[in-house]
Amino acid sequence: GIGAILKVLSTGLPALISWIKRKRQE
């Protein structure tokens, strides 16, 4: 359901953003 999708986004998005920020700093 949508709740599972939101849960995945809420946990995965911060990690993805921090990873992108690290990659862009290099």
From Swiss-Prot:
Expression by tissue: Expressed by the venom gland.
UniProt xrefs under InterPro entries: Melittin/Api_allergen
Compartment(s) of residence: Secreted; Target cell membrane
Entry-annotated residues carrying N-formylglycine: 1
Pfam families reported for this sequence: Melittin
Site (Important for the flexibility at the center of the helix, flexibility that is important for the stability of the voltage-gated pore): 14
Any one of the GO BP annotations: killing of cells of another organism
One cellular-component annotation, GO: other organism cell membrane
Domain of life assignment: Eukaryota
Described purpose of this protein according to its UniProt entry: Main toxin of bee venom with strong hemolytic activity and antimicrobial activity. It has enhancing effects on bee venom phospholipase A2 activity. This amphipathic toxin binds to negatively charged membrane surface and forms pore by inserting into lipid bilayers inducing the leakage of ions and molecules and the enhancement of permeability that ultimately leads to cell lysis. It acts as a voltage-gated pore with higher selectivity for anions over cations. The ion conductance has been shown to be voltage-dependent.
Family that this chain belongs to: Belongs to the melittin family.
Subunit (UniProt): Monomer (in solution and for integration into membranes), homotetramer (in solution and potentially as a toroidal pore in membranes), and potenially homomultimer (as a toroidal pore in membranes).
Protein name: Melittin
Lineage, opening ranks: Eukaryota, Metazoa, Ecdysozoa, Arthropoda, Hexapoda
Gene: MELT
